[in-house]
A protein has these predicted regions:
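Aromatic- and glycine-enriched beta-alpha-beta binding-site module
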Residues: 69-121
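C-terminal structured interaction module
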Residues: 197-245
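Aromatic/basic-lined ligand-recognition segments
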Residues: 1, 59, 111-189
Length: 245
């Protein structure tokens, strides 16, 4: 058995968003009337309530807006923009799912997704000169890690899906990664800084009973933490200032 993988906590954390999303067969009661019973069960943690922009769902959020729940007629999602520990996010997801299951009673979730989005900003970490092959594992960089490749990189994006080697072949890993230009609201693209986007999405392709949800999410989290550590080389790891366990 492989050792348990834990996320390294960084002072300059690159993780910008974590989302757990559950799909289920359409529930027509959700768009037909406001989910008052569900709100009653999650209001202590998510007191702010608003419809989604398309008016087809609802958003329940903390007052600081750093964590929120999105409910539509066929999806339930918990999103966190200040991730620090898996146990804390896992507990939040469990509480929301329990509230949803109590009110709506789904027999199964048709798709279960755990997604981590990370944005690496070497200049913000004080790294100069910028040499990506000294920061990101060459296996992740692909051809951009080849020696002798010169020029100012303008952009790169790669998208692939792999079947994970267990769970009966029903689990998938989607990786979206590449180079981006990071700009602040007042900046133009020309004055932005180079960044590297790493989006890890783990999901099921077969229905999952609610009682199997927690162990599957735990497994997805382990896969995500392991892959993240494989991608980050020592120089980048140090520059992001790892915190003591």
């Amino acid at each position: 058995m492989e050792p348990r993988q834990e996320w390294t906590r960084y002072t300059k954390s690159p993780i910008v968003e974590v989302t757990c999303q559950l799909h289920f067969p359409d529930l027509l009661t959700i768009p037909a009337s406001p989910p008052a019973a569900f709100q009653d069960k999650v209001r202590a943690r998510y007191p702010h309530f608003a419809p989604t922009q398309d008016r087809r769902g609802y958003v329940f959020s903390r007052l600081d807006r750093q964590e929120f729940v999105t409910l539509t007629q066929n999806t339930l999602a918990v999103t966190l923009t200040t991730f620090s520990e898996w146990a804390e996010f896992r507990a939040a997801c469990a509480g929301v799912e329990t509230a949803f299951r109590t009110v709506y009673g789904p027999a199964a979730y048709t798709r279960t997704t755990l997604r981590y989005r990370s944005l690496f900003r070497p200049q913000a970490y004080g790294i100069t000169p910028l040499e990506w092959d000294q920061l990101i594992n060459a296996a992740a960089l692909g051809p951009l890690a080849l020696p002798g490749l010169e020029g100012a990189l303008q952009g790169s994006r790669h998208d692939l899906v792999l079947a994970l080697p267990s769970a009966g072949g029903t689990d998938r890993f989607r990786l979206v990664h590449g180079f981006v230009t990071v700009t602040e609201p007042a900046q133009s693209r020309a004055s932005g800084e180079p960044g590297y986007l790493l989006e890890q999405e783990y999901f099921t392709i077969d229905p999952l009973p609610p009682q199997q949800l927690a162990p599957r999410l735990d497994r997805f989290n382990q896969e995500a933490a392991r892959f993240f550590k494989h991608c980050v080389l020592e120089r980048l790891h140090t520059a992001m200032m790892p915190m003591a366990a």
